[in-house]
Amino acid sequence: MKKPFYITTPIYYPSGKLHIGSAYTTIACDVLARYKRLMGHEVFYLTGLDEHGQKIQTKAKEAGITPQTYVDNMAKDVKALWQLLDISYDTFIRTTDDYHEEVVAAVFEKLLAQDDIYLGEYSGWYSVSDEEFFTESQLKEVFRDEDGQVIGGIAPSGHEVEWVSEESYFLRLSKYADRLVAFFKERPDFIQPDGRMNEMVKNFIEPGLEDLAVSRTTFTWGVPVPSDPKHVVYVWIDALLNYATALGYGQANHANFDKFWNGTVFHMVGKDILRFHSIYWPILLMMLDLPMPDRLIAHGWFVMKDGKMSKSKGNVVYPEMLVERFGLDPLRYYLMRSLPVGSDGTFTPEDYVGRINYELANDLGNLLNRTVAMINKYFDGTVPAYVDNGTAFDADLSQLIDAQLADYHKHMEAVDYPRALEAVWTIIARTNKYIDETAPWVLAKEDGDKAQLASVMAHLAASLRVVAHVIQPFMMETSAAIMAQLGLAPVSDLSTLALADFPANTKVVAKGTPIFPRLDMEAEIDYIKAQMGDSSAISQEKEWVPEEVALKSEKDVITFETFDAVEIRVAEVKEVSKVEGSEKLLRFRVDAGDGQDRQILSGIAKCYPNEQELVGKKLQIVANLKPRKMMKQYISQGMILSAEHGDQLTVLTVDPSVPNGSIIG
């Protein structure tokens, strides 16, 4: 019997309308939940809202309503969005739910009694929007008065901060720092993608893990501390405990908690809240003597060509405007295909419409249309019985499908959706090529080979059946439509995916309808831009016609052969430290795929005052540069490539999924 599977989104903060960033996380978890169900697991999928906090209280006051009314309205809107996106969650938790608040209060008192929470005082720069405190050195920008005193600043998120000094209860994170590091060493795959764990250790634990303020007295919209009700529980104990309370932890009926928390537990979050989930949450579980989750997946963001989404820039994309125009499945497909694991992805209207036309309409839609039409034309709509090796091309098609199915399952288990879908589209492309190779219109002629024609039709139908199965977690409507046109029931499991498993004597529909009609590219791109509010860009972009220009370079022009002599490789930073006696140099230990690490010295120290942020990054290096001795004692075995802009140097990084030692060229 397969282990129960528990998957969670973060609980979203209902301070505004959710855009495609939040939709991405929720759909990504939904895809995994559906896949695991099809693979025979009992699944519990959790999502919900974080409904407490100062920002909610302030927004409710501005709207002239109570905080409860405000979050009730937001919850209604978010549930409607998840229904539109066909999200198959099992529970939608709200931190204002009575059962959750009761457990939060009880846990707070338990930790207070065991001295994992203590009373102190906190002073620091606080961002209401981020619900987070910052030190002066962490601020993106600092405001000073005429005497040079700091009077305010900007948080890394871009929100303003204010000075806050108040009594607060603290969670003893520092007490558990060594135990957390030991856990990370025992479970190096706990945080995905690779490299993110090193960031957390180097940036937050090694410099000294500070205790965390977990109560506030300057607002009232939260869970009161039972033994000291002028305090309300502040954000992270309240928010993080939802993953346990939703299953029944701390309640009379805890059967789901016993089942699913002892199964396989996956959390998926955006990279901006990784610290809270990778440090605060495991330590909280240690304090409560509860088992650790199996995996914490921190994904990147969808950004625009001109940076992060912003209403003022006219570049915000809401899921509703895409679903209402193009349907649900194109959105789910686009989001899951377009965001590389561990990296950010760029949304453009051109790419969105292009993927619908080229990948969904052309590749998949045309394959289905041609197959159904030919089976009707040549065999009166009945799919011929499947036989192996009816043509010279059958074995190759079958072998490719088997190999791509193995890749698909491997990537699905790794939550690498772009590569899983790439495997599916490799099957689609190979099946389209199979039509051209076998030329059924020739086999159908009077002097043709009817047995081979029958084998071709059977292989086409069987291949489409496989495709309909493996896209089901991503595109439920499309999967059902393909199965219906093939005369089959909707997909219910992924256990029988061999070509030979196609049911005998199946009759396809008499006339198939296009599942993805081709779109007018220019009109639909203009529609998306108009919905985004970017009216200035509509129908005004002219095709770029390249002209021969005089090359501008600070150095002499070189030949391709000269450039080809330079070997640029991907290298992962394992360690980095300042070089004693030098203000400019950093000393790197990198894995460049040589079989053993190499040492490189780079003069970028002034541009990276916190050099540990580079640990885990994958950089570009010149790998075949002659080693040279530096500072009389170090041998530098390569060069780290950086982009120079003004006085600043920025190292060139690559997608974390690219293997170490990969050649760039």
UniProtKB/Swiss-Prot annotation:
The keyword Electron transport does not apply. The gene is metG. A motif ('KMSKS' region) lies at residues 308-312. HAMAP family: Met_tRNA_synth_type2. Belongs to the class-I aminoacyl-tRNA synthetase family. MetG type 2B subfamily. It is found in: Cytoplasm. InterPro entries: Anticodon_Met, Met-tRNA-synth_bsu_C, Met-tRNA_synth, Met-tRNA_synth_2, Methionyl/Leucyl_tRNA_Synth, MetRS_core, NA-bd_OB-fold, Rossmann-like_a/b/a_fold. A motif ('HIGH' region) lies at residues 12-22. Its main location: cytoplasm. It comes from Streptococcus pyogenes serotype M6 (strain ATCC BAA-946 / MGAS10394). It holds the Pfam family Anticodon_3. This is Methionine--tRNA ligase. Its EC number is 6.1.1.10.
